[in-house]
């Protein structure tokens, strides 16, 4: 895994970035050359210095991709003249460009990876490729994408265009401040795109305004996300495996992971979103409205996009429409507070386990307000769950010990009735009844606890609060394996990391199996039981070796408490046996 990560970070990603940049630059040049050819052939007559906007028939309408010529032309982006504007708030820095008035960078001020601010958007400044909140104007038989249109950028209240590299600072003293992008076509048609920022929220309002007279064909506005998000974690392959695209339509939620798909939907549009393990970007309709949506993906390169088509409502000759952008962490409480159902994207397990997972997450966060160390909080949760299931596990351990005590008598029955299975079954059940032993008593309580463990697994593995949360010493990130040292060679199944908690957990499981004892019986059964006692701790150590250290810490504490409980039960049973023996002697 470490070698794959090194290859991704040091060789593959930089190389692919160069290839992608070259491809985008080539496409941009081809666009400009195409516009020049159209002007020289007279298709753009009367629009000197202005590129003819290319209207494409929507693929989801006709599938033909035919091209027609617009009545009015808009300036086409020239790569050398693209201006990049940065908006800085206490929560994030976002960059927008005059190429389509799109958002091309979003860095979160409160989250870092290897010392650098987390960057969510996998997009550069090349025009015509779409980005976050890219817009296309849709008609019955044509589409006008704005990605290649050259806008001018203005700060709120200013009539002077912003220059390349301008920084607009928005703090608590300037809530609701905005950034505006304007363009005028050859026939006077105007389009304005705007962004409004709240310095205390990860939500950005993005809107568009234009006169319906200049663009009479427009029936709806398409808002797009994609072609993916930038990996934010050190372990790039694992982070890419968590890439998802999702959609809420009415009361239905649609989620797709990496793969080949192209699905279209119609209904009441709420939102569409892209997400990695800990962060998400979502397009939300301010008010749910009837429209269409599309989700696309390619397995080969992880390409994923989402788009929503919302109707263009005209008022007094003007069309205005907006969406809300959420660009930030997958924080359950923050997403739930939006009232859009985006908290459904938090990985909390199946719909049957989500209520339990939500309760566990709530407990985790509340305890952390009192104890500012998530490692100690996890230990307390482990102790609490052990107390909660104490009687169940007590019955389980006691039942297993009782079964061990019955093994000699059960073996005698097998020898006595080895040729009569029906009689053997009857006598076995009779023995269980006389001894007051339930053959399922050892495993049933453990089965009942499994949903809780699965719930804790989901919460501890996916919650943003544990990202880079330290415990103590070398354990500086409970969302990652605890790495004490790195070996010069990679070991099979384990990699080159030296992790302590999984080894301690495996050792604890071995001690627990020794204390629990093995099943008495013939030599072959005893040998198998002993082999199983040694194998299970090894299997669990390998299984948990690359798990988040917060989850391993929970299981380690649970194992230590189980050792104490088993020891206590054994001591009680031995004392009872001695008392029975002494009573038998005196009587």
Placement of each model-derived feature along the sequence:
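Juxtamembrane extramembrane loops of integral membrane proteins
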Residues: 9-125, 181, 585-587
